[in-house]
Amino acid sequence: MTPFEDRYKNRVSEIREIFGEENYLRIMFDIEVAWWYAINNPKAGIAEFAIFFNEVKHKFSYKRIKEHECETNHDVVALVRFLKEDCGMTNAHYGLTSQDVVSLAYSISAYKASKFIGTKLGSLCDDLKTFYGSVDRMVGYTHGQKATPISTQNLLDVIINEDKIGISSMRDRLKIRPETRFGNGACGDRYSIKNVENEWEFEKNVKRCLTMVSCAHDISGLNRSTYSRQTDYYPYIASLSETIKLLSLLLKRESVNIWLLASKGIVVKINTAQEAGSSAMPQKVNPIEFENAEGNAELCEAMANVMINKAMSSRLDRDLSDLTVMRNLGSMFGYLTLAITSMSRGLKRYSLDADLIEETISNSHEMLAESVSLMMQKNGVAGAYDIAKGMFMSKKDMSREDFEDCVMGTEEIPEEIKQELLKLEL
């Protein structure tokens, strides 16, 4: 059905484990167990819960829960039946809705996936630094044409360190703590709970439960919103999806940029002896890793848009259209993982041709046109831009000798300024 299941399954094994059905049910099991313990042991602390949890977690049975689901046609009800009938937790799920458990489970899964993505992004940054750090400068292209030489350090800073939209900034944004509407009742205002329970005591148990869940899943606290409908508008997942969308756009952009450099011969494959680029043309060496990164980034972007739009909507106080979308949350992270992995593979298997870069720069003195124009403007030469335009427009592959001849042969430039222009270097 998807390449996650076969062709790329080893590349997304961590994501498949996080979002697999069994792990999803296990997280919901942990949440229900923590809630049961909180309401039945009001004076117990985290240490006592940790001991209890280590004993009871082994009772989880994916097989038995799925057997119950064959009858209930509802995964949470099946889980609750398992807790009551197989684990002896007779008041399991008391005061909760399925949305309480489901939305928290997805937030925990998304948090774990985000930590994994953060690690992958750290490795990608290292690969980018190695790839671009092999040379000090490159040819800069605007509108597909040679413009000026550019520093590769500046290029790396744009990709990695640019404020808000660089990899480092987005990596930091993936570290935000999960948020949940856990314990807010059937329509979000705890109406039935307030009719039956002491609301203050109930809220205290909710906070204790969330602390226990955080402990069980190594999360440094869970943020809780007390304002909601039954439907969780998934502010945490919506925020993550927005960051992931921006990440996918960056990965797509940089994959395309490297592909374009490959088309100019500036990026070359390190080892091609055992590989084929085409089933018909033996000479071909294709930058498929960057093409794969681009395609998977586009799929990730599309999934992120769906997650953002669906997470923030519901019919009145509750419907289930969000849940069928959330079941595909792992696919968004899967496509992002493939994009990052493909790009990293490409960066390791290709290199910049330093000799060709320097040869191109040395034979492209038309790239000094802007500097010539600015130098003349600085020295008060009238019509400096138009003079430079006449000197360099449509000129290509200009050698140093051609540049010097062009400067010396331009009558509109005063002699003393010509000497300054001849000092300009690429």
Region locations from a protein language model:
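A helix-coil-helix interface module used to build multimeric assemblies
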Residues: 1-189, 194, 201, 205, ...
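Catalytic-core signal marking the mid-to-C-terminal active-site face
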Residues: 1-21, 276-426
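Amphipathic alpha-helices that form helix-helix packing interfaces
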Residues: 31, 35-38, 117, 121-124, ...
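Alpha-helix capping and helix-loop boundary segments enriched in small/acidic/polar residues
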Residues: 101, 143-154, 197-204, 227-231, ...
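Coiled-coil heptad-register positions
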Residues: 132, 136-139, 262, 315, ...
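Alpha-helical coiled-coil oligomerization motifs
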Residues: 133, 175-178, 259, 266, ...
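Glycine-rich anion/phosphate-binding loop at the beta-strand->alpha-helix junction
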Residues: 166, 229-310, 314-317
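A short, charged helix-loop
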Residues: 208-229
